[in-house]
């Protein structure tokens, strides 16, 4: 198949899911929601679990919505961008935010644990950045889990003995399956509200501007959508 920036696409019906009266805008966000749903299922986040989310990008923010819907408490989310942390706070007012600074992973972890007032049972790592993964390892409790959703370098260093002596599970996600029907139900029922994540919208004819906006951190874009009125 060539590109999907087109008004009409032929696709096998067997691989399509009906979204009913859901907006196409929300429908387009079912894919990142599927990423988060797979992570929720495989990481085992439960009601009352203290959770750390590393990274307040689109996946981290949707993971935040899922953790709140699942009853995780407290939830701490981290990022290097204060604007994204402010956005996370607007999305889920009860979330605790940590601005990542140029300090060691251990120092970051100490600040995060102090903010949460408890060691997280699970860390959902949504950046793939080596220092962020290491921070998550230093944060979680004995027997906790660091679940890496983000994609990082081919090779990176980890605090191996921290993982070993604290019996921390390090788990990864690269693909997902069978999530679409669940994602559709959650959005249609209002359990998960994705509407605030689209911060910029462009017509199909302005697709180049859309990509430029998405690539420029100064725009504060979370999700940029290209739409067609036809």
Question: Whereabouts are the PLM-identified features?
Answer:
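Glycine-rich cofactor phosphate-binding loops and adjacent beta1-alpha1 units
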Residues: 43, 68-70, 85-169, 208, ...
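Glycine- and other small-residue-rich loops at beta-strand/loop junctions that grip anionic moieties
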Residues: 8, 28, 56, 77, ...
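Mid-domain Rossmann-like dinucleotide-binding core that forms the NAD(H)/NADP(H) cofactor-binding site
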Residues: 21-103
